[in-house]
Amino acid sequence: MAAAVRAAGFLPALCGASAGRLWSRQLYLNTFPTASIWALKAVPSNGPSSSAGARGRCRSTHLGPALQTQCCTPAPGNVTAQQYRSYSFFTKLTADELWKGALAETGAGARKGRGKRTKRKRRKDLNRGQIIGEGRRGFLWPGLNAPLMKSGAIQTITQRSKEEQEKVEADMVQQREEWDRKRKMKVKRERGWSGNSWGGISLGPPDPGPNGETYDDFDTRILEVRNVFNMTAKEGRKRSVRVLVAVGNGRGAAGFAIGKATERADAFRKAKNRAVHYLHYIERYEDHTIYHDISLTFKRTHIKMKKQPRGYGLRCHRAITTICRLIGIKDMYAKVSGSVNMLSLTRGLFQGLSRQETHQQLADKKSLHVVEFREECGPLPIVVASPQGALRKDPEPEDEVPDIKLDWDDVKAVQGMKRSVWSGLKRAAT
């Protein structure tokens, strides 16, 4: 708002100049802060009342409040205004730099993680609740803290009464106290795999893309949060946060990515938005399980997955269970042996699931019918896929039959030899 106000009535008296002339320029309120000090240089006119000794400089600290009244009074003809602002250490720094100094967020101690157990002060937003145009004197400026138009007419600058101004200030103090009280309340986050880890916690859908695309049907789950360090020549041991997340829509589309940043929240955001750009489509048999058993080795991690009927559920490693739910797999058994590095486990799982072969692909490859034997159907085979081309007459050669290595625990379970180590234990008499 640029409300033009002409000079105050006592300007001629302050400057010692003759009245009867108006200022040639208009003074705008946004260029006259109340706390500023103005030095007015009075240039003598050609009249008899002027003299060479009258040239001087007069300063007024109460000129700002006088200019807040809308008036039009005569003023000297040649008056130049120069603005003086108080200059100190606090005007050189920004609010963020001042807060960092007050909260001890800078220095080697903060970078190396020292002082974490002390009672830390909280940063306050001092601009919160402030309205442009509001002041202690209670002036109502149309377009700032008051509507510009009222009943079809432009409002003029008015002032609240003393009682109304006290009520407005009391309401503002009460509102700030409520904000501080709400900030201290802790909201219980969703429980993940355990109470003291970030694994399994949902981050919500990824952020919308630059072209307006949204991912509301996707969900993001945290798999791992680690603090990593890099030794630099300038800052020494520099700490950063590495986050591994997985995203999926529950209908076969899923992906994973890593986000790195100095702050944990920034790492979450980076990983979540990056994972949606590296999606895999996983084929599912009847939208509930995998097409066939999968056994794979990724680096030092060994994963063995088995197809299961409906109602079996997910009996897997907790990270595999989280990823399968994001994919849409509901029934599967998986066993992890060797290294349980989270990144190797995730990469190996996506590699094995994305390379599985559907029944139709297997039928076209072998030129044979693909049949399935179910326990409820007995020896009756169920045809699940047929080749699209000509059917081969001769059976599959023995060399092409995959050599599946059986797990000894599975063999003992089938033959009834697998028993608990505590089955024959007898408690001593007391």
UniProtKB/Swiss-Prot annotation:
User: Which key words are in the record?
Assistant: Mitochondrion, Ribonucleoprotein, Ribosomal protein
Comp. bias regions, Basic residues: 111-125
| Residue span, S5 DRBM domain | 218-282
Q: Which domain of life is it from?
A: Eukaryota
Keyword Kinase attached: no
Taken from the record, one Pfam family name reads Ribosomal_uS5m_N
What is its quaternary makeup? Answer: Component of the mitochondrial ribosome small subunit (28S) which comprises a 12S rRNA and about 30 distinct proteins.
Which family does the entry's similarity section mention?
Belongs to the universal ribosomal protein uS5 family.
Specify the protein name: Small ribosomal subunit protein uS5m
Q: Which gene encodes it?
A: MRPS5
